[in-house]
Swiss-Prot record:
The gene is rpl10e. CDD domains: Ribosomal_L16_L10e. One of its GO terms (biological process) is translation. HAMAP family: Ribosomal_uL16_arch (MF_00448). InterPro entries: Ribosomal_uL16, Ribosomal_uL16_arc, Ribosomal_uL16_CS_euk_arc, Ribosomal_uL16_dom, Ribosomal_uL16_euk_arch, Ribosomal_uL16_sf. This is Large ribosomal subunit protein uL16.
Length: 176
């Protein structure tokens, strides 16, 4: 089945739909790794990707953003010189009411009768000033990390900003 455009699910409407025990079956989220890189090292610079508007981020968009940052930082710095954590978990279940189209569809379908929909995916609900990603690195790779987070923000359905939470004086001296 074709994946619907993310704009169909990006607005927050109604209460969260998370009780999986009442559903027939929910597809697993595509994002499975939430923490990457060197978790033991204490890095001097920490940056966060912060949402500016309320939205729902599909599990595929979270995975695309994670892969984007991971690939860029692995090529630039290597796995030992950065840390990445994806904060929101896609708990909210997205539903879709499948509609038959084409010749003779009116005889087969029941229209809007019993139009509750079947689970098709999951999403994370994010509100303004919620942290989406936390990333840490050293001085040598700080500019690359900021660029990687900015490119990851493009893959998400909400405008985001990169906030430096640790090492502002170091980042200021580097011109970030």
């Amino acid at each position: 089945m074709v994946t619907k455009p993310a704009r169909m699910y990006s607005r927050i409407t109604g209460p969260a739909y998370t009780r999986k025990e009442f559903m027939g079956g929910v597809p697993y989220p595509k994002i499975t790794t939430f923490v990457q890189g060197n978790q033991k090292k204490d890095f001097p610079i920490e940056m966060r990707l912060v949402a500016e508007e309320p939205c729902q981020i599909r599990h595929t968009a979270l995975e695309a953003a994670r892969v984007s940052v991971n690939r860029r930082m692995t090529e630039a710095a290597g796995l030992d010189y950065f840390y990445l954590k994806v904060v929101p978990y896609p708990h909210h279940v997205l539903r879709e009411h499948k509609m038959a189209t084409g010749a003779g569809a009116d005889r087969i379908s029941s229209g809007m009768r019993a139009a509750f929909g079947r689970p098709v995916g999951t999403a994370a609900r994010v509100y303004p000033d919620d942290v989406i990603m936390i990333a840490r690195t050293d001085e040598a790779h700080a500019k690359e990390l900021k660029t990687a987070l900015r490119k990851a923000a493009i893959k998400l359905p909400t405008p985001c900003k990169v906030v430096i939470t640790k090492g502002k004086e170091i980042a200021g001296s580097l011109g970030i």
